[in-house]
Amino acid sequence: MARLHLLAHLATMLLVSFPARAQEAITFHCTFKAVYETAESDNPTKSNFEKQFVGHGIDVFVTDKPTAKVIGDVFTITKQASDYVVSQRGSKRRDWVLFRTDHGSVSGTITETITVIHIRTWNESLRFTFAWGSIMAVGTCEQVK
C-alpha cells in the first residue's frame, strides 16, 4: 500500500500533458536502476524507496501535437499542468528534458526551473535521471521505434 501511495504521488507529479517542442513523435521506455537520497548531503546515499522504483519502468511519449505523457508501469494518472515543459536541446543527437517551473512567492515573482526527467540520447546506452524532491533516480532507456 505504501508503494502504491508513493507511486500515486509520483504519477500526479509526472503524468501530465504539457507543451512540447518536438518535430516528430518519439517514445522512450525507461527502467529505474538505482535510487539515491540527496537531502542535505554532498554524498548521496541509497534511498529507502529503492525497492519501490528499481526494476519499474516509465514510458515517455513525446508527440508533435504538442503534448507529451509520462506513464509508469503500475499507475496511470493524467493531470493538466501548464508549468511542465518538455524540450529537446543540443546537437543532432539531442537529449530530452522534462522540467517544471516553481513559483516561489505568492506574487509569482521568484521562479525556479527544476529538471524532473533528463534523457541523454547522445550515448550508446540511453541514460536518464529522475528527480523527486530529495530523491534522485537513475536508469536506462530504449527508444521505441
Locations of regions flagged by a protein language model:
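Short structural boundary motif marking the start of a folded domain
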Residues: 23-30
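Positively charged n-region of N-terminal signal peptides that target proteins for export
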Residues: 1-5
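Sec/Tat signal peptide C-region and signal peptidase I cleavage site
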Residues: 18-22
